[in-house]
Amino acid sequence: FAITIQPVSLAAGYPDSYVTNDILWYKENDSTTCSGSSSNGVSGSDNQEKIWGYLRNAGLSAEQTAGVMANIQAESGFSPTRHEVGQGWGSGGWGLAQWTFGRRTLIANKIPSELKKYYSQEYGGAPNDKGMVDSIPVEDNDKLLIFELEYLVQEGKERPVTASGFGTASNSWELLKTLKTVDDATVFWHDDFEKSAMTKDDVKNIRGTAAQKIYERFNGTGGSGGGCSSSN
């Protein structure tokens, strides 16, 4: 299958309302085309293994991948349709990274038509231990993973670095790729991309512990994933 999303990158003069809604990347008339399939885009016995393989294939080290995945685990339990607990439909976070406010609106508007039906509270509950929702076919689960992971990577490449103490780079994704340890990758991705209310100590203790377990499980394995091309 083929997925077309329309990412936007930071540009001077973008609407003030985007800032207040946490939309930090915007580029008018830009488009990104991504393609993949459940057979060669992601592979594995559970969503954890599939996400690991995709992110490794996207160019992250094992340490960086573990850091991103620990944040995904804390946010959504690896479910691409997770809806934030305690929030009415349309409010709070949604998806692997729990995109919220204007960021949620942007990704929701780009969900491929064949997958739109899963953007529903019906599928927003807690996943099973494989990170999957039992009522979603594996093929569609994998398509959702590919779509959201492609979106996450592209957003990271277009998003300016806002977290302090990790150095400088042209965007969040490039800075992430400079980090050498699991702890640094975990804290940076939280502070720069997720931006939850957790303190830095809690991030290290809770998400950092999860990241280390992910690293120990998957280190030494590679991945397979689709790709994106951007035009403007």
Predicted regions: what they are:
Residues 2-25:
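Sec-dependent signal peptide cleavage junction
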Residues 18-50, 57, 76-181:
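Peptidoglycan-targeting cell-wall enzymes and recognition modules
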Residues 49-53, 57, 66-69, 150, ...:
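Solvent-exposed, polar/charged alpha-helical surfaces in well-ordered, non-transmembrane soluble domains
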Residues 56, 60, 73-77, 157, ...:
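Hydrophobic/aromatic-lined pockets within catalytic cores
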Residues 62-79, 190:
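Short, functionally critical alpha-helical segments immediately adjacent to catalytic or ligand/cofactor-binding
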Residues 171-223, 228:
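Active-site or metal-binding loop neighborhoods of secreted/extracellular toxin and effector enzymes
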